[in-house]
């Protein structure tokens, strides 16, 4: 089904262009739906990263992924929220379990060889995170966002789905929220 991590290294030794990944993991109000972009220093992802970080707006505050305060993952990763943050409990899930889960998924992707360690200082990642207003279980938020981020990174690096895979599903696709 998916290319093994070691094979990814043979396919992509250098990240020279922007790549896109997506993953949906979990269920209920803690469901994680991750969209992300990965790109090289000097590219459009870096420009979007800097612009987003410099221009927060009410209910949408970009934040750096951190393993813990003062420890960012490498590649440097920016988290943006898909849903307007309306209350303190929703903010606490974003600025806590989701933030840490994304950072851990990025570092595990480097450790697993999915993201090239030798380029970690020259890659930027933007991760769009969904935290539903009714989400409450911080452990599920962490688990689902960790798994979804890892899967989205792998899909981006593998170029998945391929055009052929998307064409094969176009008439039978079943979106869980449609």
Swiss-Prot record:
The keyword Calcium does not apply. GO terms for cellular component: cytoplasm. Keywords: Cytoplasm, Lyase. Gene3D superfamilies: Formaldehyde-activating enzyme. Substrate binds at residues 35, 64, 82, 84, 99. It catalyses: 5,6,7,8-tetrahydromethanopterin + formaldehyde = 5,10-methylenetetrahydromethanopterin + H2O. Its main location: cytoplasm. It is found in: Cytoplasm. One of its GO terms (molecular function) is carbon-nitrogen lyase activity. The active site is at 33 (proton donor). It holds the Pfam family Fae. GO terms for biological process: carbohydrate biosynthetic process. The keyword Lyase applies. Its EC number is 4.2.1.147. InterPro entries: HCHO-activating_enzyme, HCHO-activating_enzyme_sf, Ribosomal_Su5_D2-typ_SF. Belongs to the formaldehyde-activating enzyme family. NCBIfam families: one_C_fae. Catalyzes the condensation of formaldehyde with tetrahydromethanopterin (H(4)MPT) to 5,10-methylenetetrahydromethanopterin. This is 5,6,7,8-tetrahydromethanopterin hydro-lyase. It comes from Methanosarcina barkeri (strain Fusaro / DSM 804). The gene is faeA.
């Amino acid at each position: 089904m998916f290319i093994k991590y070691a094979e990814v290294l043979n396919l992509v030794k250098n990240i020279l262009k922007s790549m896109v990944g997506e993953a949906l993991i979990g269920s209920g109000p803690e469901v994680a739906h991750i969209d992300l972009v990965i790109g090289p220093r000097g590219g459009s992802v870096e420009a979007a990263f800097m612009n987003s970080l410099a221009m927060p707006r009410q209910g949408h505050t970009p934040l750096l992924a951190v393993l813990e305060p003062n420890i960012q993952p490498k590649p440097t990763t920016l988290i943006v929220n898909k849903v307007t943050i309306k209350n303190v409990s929703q903010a606490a899930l974003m600025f806590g379990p989701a933030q840490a889960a994304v950072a851990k998924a990025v570092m595990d992707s480097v450790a697993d060889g999915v993201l090239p360690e030798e380029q970690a200082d020259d890659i930027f990642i933007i991760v769009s995170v969904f935290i539903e207003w009714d989400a409450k279980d911080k452990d599920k938020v962490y688990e689902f966002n960790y798994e979804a981020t890892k899967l989205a990174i792998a899909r981006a690096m593998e170029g998945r789905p391929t055009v052929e895979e998307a064409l094969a599903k176009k008439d039978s696709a079943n979106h869980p929220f449609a």
